[in-house]
Regions:
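Extreme N-terminal export signal peptides that direct proteins to the secretory pathway
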Residues: 1-54
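Short amphipathic beta-strand and strand-loop transition segments with alternating hydrophobic
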Residues: 4-9, 88, 162-166
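Short, solvent-exposed secondary-structure capping/transition elements
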Residues: 34, 97, 142-144
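A generic structural signal for beta-strand entry/edge sites
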Residues: 21-23, 34-36, 54-56, 63, ...
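Proteolytic cleavage junctions
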Residues: 103-189
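Generic structural motif
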Residues: 20, 27-31, 42-44, 53, ...
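Short aromatic-centered micro-motifs
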Residues: 39, 59, 151
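Self-processing/autoproteolytic domain segments and adjacent N-terminal interaction modules in large
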Residues: 51-127, 189
Length: 189
């Protein structure tokens, strides 16, 4: 599938491999409000992305979109040296601290992880960036300038992600990361 997407992207971009952007879209319309998304790329697919100098890999999961830049793809290839599994799932809010629960409220919480086939997990990339966009439709009661992305730490505390912001045009909360963790949409009081 990935090889087909790369070939399609090359044709669409007139063979300009330097600016090649590959997009994988999950058909979430049938799933409605999905609980789990799982993308497995074998070692050949990861190698092909790096070999073709793909500028970015976009993984569109409906509620959550991840965009890996070329440095992140190279780092994943280097770190995993095998197949790569990208997982996005709705997280359980039971583990949130009381304070985090107030910040997050009924807003979405997701777990992101990247593992190799041998269950080796990547938590932080040494190089590269991942742009994350989480769908969220702000209510009229919420001040859009107070909506941010929060990292949920191992104690259930919510830590605001620097540079995160709400985009009212796309109705997404956006941030850039080097790591994989539990993230939530929250609103400052």
């Amino acid at each position: 599938v990935l090889k087909k997407e790369i070939t399609k992207a090359e044709k669409e971009q007139g063979g300009r491999i330097k600016d090649l952007s590959v997009e994988i879209t999950f058909d979430t319309a049938k799933a409605g409000n999905w609980k789990n998304l799982h993308l497995e790329m074998d070692g050949q697919a990861v190698n092909l992305l790096v070999k073709k100098n793909v500028k970015e890999l976009k993984v569109n999961g409906g509620n959550v979109n991840l965009t890996f830049d070329s440095k992140a793809l190279k780092e994943l290839k280097k770190e995993m040296n095998t197949a790569v599994v990208i997982k996005m799932k709705q997280a359980d809010k039971k583990n949130l601290s009381a304070r985090a629960g107030k910040i997050i409220g009924k807003r979405p919480v997701y777990d992101f992880s990247v593992t190799g086939i041998k269950k080796k997990q990547s938590s932080v990339l040494k190089k590269g960036r991942i742009r994350v966009a989480v769908s969220y439709n702000a209510s009229k009661k919420e001040k859009e300038k107070k909506i941010f992305a929060y990292k949920i730490d191992k104690y259930g505390a919510a830590v605001k992600i620097p540079g995160s912001y709400y985009d009212s045009d796309t109705k997404t909360v956006n941030f850039v990361s080097r790591g994989f963790f539990t993230v939530a949409v929250g609103c400052e009081k």
